[in-house]
């Protein structure tokens, strides 16, 4: 490893640690007294086997996640897959704190956890997870692509009726697709972990910001797409900037 790479890796670690240390997750109030995923989370969990790692997601990984997710949200908003058109579909943005929470989650080496994920900025972010295993592991980019494809294929079982009523927290094996196309989600951040236990394993996890959870529909229908948008996104014509204010 060159000195430049060593410096970049050390700098990335310092930045991640500074984000984590900026907030004392142990003092946050969590429902039902649950432990917070970021509280005293200095190392890897008991399920992690040998040589656990959390590879850094670089700009090319972040760009790919946002491009594919926002493409999907856009075509759904336009009425693809026989779904109703969406009156408003925010274009997702990347959030570093959500990504940090996702990275902390993956350090447990489990796909799902009941641990609290609330922060001072976000109340109970949603979560989507994917796990892969084998004699070898593909590249980080391939793992991310496999995860997004796995979540996307849940569309084959997600119906128009589900679009109209899919209560928050419900999981019929379709939660990941429902999360990806929800108009209540405005930001995303993801993390990746790899370890060896019998064989090689990888876990990809995304935390998602829900701006509200009272409405049971995945998104609000419209006579046409973007009818509740003041101005559509320059790249995704069926989407709207995530910070545009509106009333439900």
Curated annotation (Swiss-Prot):
Pfam family for this entry, one: CAP
Source domain of life: Eukaryota
Family: Belongs to the CRISP family.
Protein name: Tabinhibitin 10
Domain called SCP: residue spans: 66-208
Keyword entries, A-Z: Cell adhesion impairing toxin, Hemostasis impairing toxin, Platelet aggregation inhibiting toxin, Secreted, Signal, Toxin
Gene3D superfamilies: CAP
Compartmental location: Secreted
Native source species: Tabanus yao (Horsefly)
SMART domains attached to this UniProt entry: SCP (SM00198)
Protein's job: Inhibits platelet aggregation induced by all agonists tested (ADP, arachidonic acid, the thromboxane A2 analog U46619, thrombin, and snake venom snaclecs (TMVA that activates platelet through GPIB, and stejnulxin that specifically acts through GPVI (GP6))). May act by competing with fibrinogen for binding to glycoprotein IIb/IIIa (ITGA2B/ITGB3).
Region forming the signal peptide: 1-22
GO MF: toxin activity
């Amino acid at each position: 490893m060159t000195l430049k790479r060593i410096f970049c890796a050390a700098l990335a670690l310092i930045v991640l640690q500074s984000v984590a240390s900026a907030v004392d997750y142990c003092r946050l109030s969590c429902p039902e007294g649950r432990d917070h995923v970021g509280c005293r989370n200095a190392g890897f969990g008991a399920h992690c086997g040998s040589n656990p790692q959390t590879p850094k997601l670089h700009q090319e990984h972040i760009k790919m996640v946002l491009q594919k997710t926002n493409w999907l949200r856009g075509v759904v908003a336009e009425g693809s897959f026989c779904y109703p058109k969406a009156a408003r579909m925010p274009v997702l943005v990347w959030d570093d704190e959500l990504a940090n929470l996702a990275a902390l989650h993956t350090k447990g080496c489990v796909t799902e956890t009941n641990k609290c994920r609330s922060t001072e900025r976000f109340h109970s972010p949603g979560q989507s997870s994917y796990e892969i295993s084998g004699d070898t592991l593909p590249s980080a980019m391939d793992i991310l692509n496999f995860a997004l494809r796995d979540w996307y294929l849940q569309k084959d079982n997600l119906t128009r009726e589900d679009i109209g009523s899919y209560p928050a927290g419900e999981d019929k094996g379709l939660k990941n697709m429902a999360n990806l196309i929800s108009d209540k989600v405005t930001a995303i951040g993801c993390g990746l972990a790899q370890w060896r236990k019998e064989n090689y394993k990888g876990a990809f996890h995304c935390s998602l910001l829900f701006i509200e959870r009272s409405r049971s529909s995945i998104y609000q229908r419209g006579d046409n797409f973007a009818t509740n948008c003041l101005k559509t996104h320059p790249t995704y014509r069926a989407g709207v900037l995530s910070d545009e204010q509106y009333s439900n």
